[in-house]
Amino acid sequence: MSPSLVSDTQKHERGSHGVKIKHFSPYIAVCVTTFSLAFCCFMVHGAITRQPTHLLPFFFIQVFDLIICLIHILGFMSSTSDIRLVIHTKTGPIYIKSTGLTFIILSISRMMLAFKAYCLGMVWDCYKYLMLNRRGNLLDDWYSDQWGHLSTFWSLLRTGRNRGNNSIGNSGSPNEPNTRPRPDTITYDPANDLPKYEDILKIPANAYTPPPYYCSNTNGNVNTTTTDAVTTNTTITSATTVNATTTITTNANTNTSTTTSVISPLTTTNKDDTQINNASSNAHSSC
């Protein structure tokens, strides 16, 4: 390379470097760094105090950073030839093919996107964990979901974050549901929380009157049922007695009527015989 070409290249580099310094503003970098640190501290405070809403600002910053990184990668991919030209115009020229340069840029960009997506997924998982704890749900309901609650491309990045450890250790298979019994709810026993002796002395003697006397509902129902049963039996007995008496009376009346009807013809026959005998006696007397 001729000395004139080297001097022109150095001048061009100095000029471009000077333009970059003119357009660079350190105040913007300081503001971005300050806000990033503030939101990071806010996220740590929310994770310690279990307040999920404090994690949202840092989460949105990560989403914005991921989008900006993706745009930068697309810009580098569209200007690969310019990068190759800059590399070849250095003092010590480096000869590299465009295919190799594209492969290097793609590898680095994929690693950056994967790392940013992994961090974003961790923040989202922490937010969902705190929300479920606030609602009173158990961790098993969260770990039983193998695909998570954020159905995007970074849900496939599960390296180092196996959510199914608890369910696999308990049930033996990640596809089997978790059948562990839930812990019993804690009940409050008022007998263990007794009042103080001084508070009891301050209560007047007639503050609580005794309740009125009453029979037990169970005994009352049993007695009522027994009384009803006895009454029913008595009614049935009375009805049976009345029916028997009526039947006997009817039979007696029937027998009496039959006897009367039988006696009446006999009496009539006897009267006729008496009249015949009297008539024959009168005839003999006349003779």
From Swiss-Prot:
The keyword Membrane applies. GO terms for cellular component: lysosomal membrane; plasma membrane. The lineage of its organism: Eukaryota, Discoba, Euglenozoa, Kinetoplastea, Metakinetoplastina. It is a multi-pass membrane protein. The chain crosses the membrane at residues 28-48, 56-76, 92-114. It is found in: Cell membrane. PANTHER family: LYSOSOMAL-ASSOCIATED TRANSMEMBRANE PROTEIN. The keyword Phosphoprotein does not apply. This is Tetraspanning orphan receptor. Cell surface receptor that binds to human complement C2a protein. This results in inhibition of the classical and lectin pathways of complement activation, probably due to interference with binding of C2a to C4b and interference with cleavage by C1 or MASP2 such that C3 convertase cannot be formed. This infers resistance to complement-mediated cell lysis, allowing parasite survival and infection. Disulfide bonds: none annotated. Keywords: Cell membrane, Membrane, Receptor, Transmembrane, Transmembrane helix. Residues 49-55, 115-287 are cytoplasmic. Residues 165-190 are annotated as: Disordered. The C-sensitive epimastigote form of the Colombiana strain is more susceptible to lysis than the Y strain at all human serum concentrations. Potential vaccine candidate molecule. Its main location: membrane. It comes from Trypanosoma cruzi. Interacts (via N-terminal extracellular domain) with human C2a. Residues 1-27, 77-91 are extracellular. It comes from the Eukaryota.
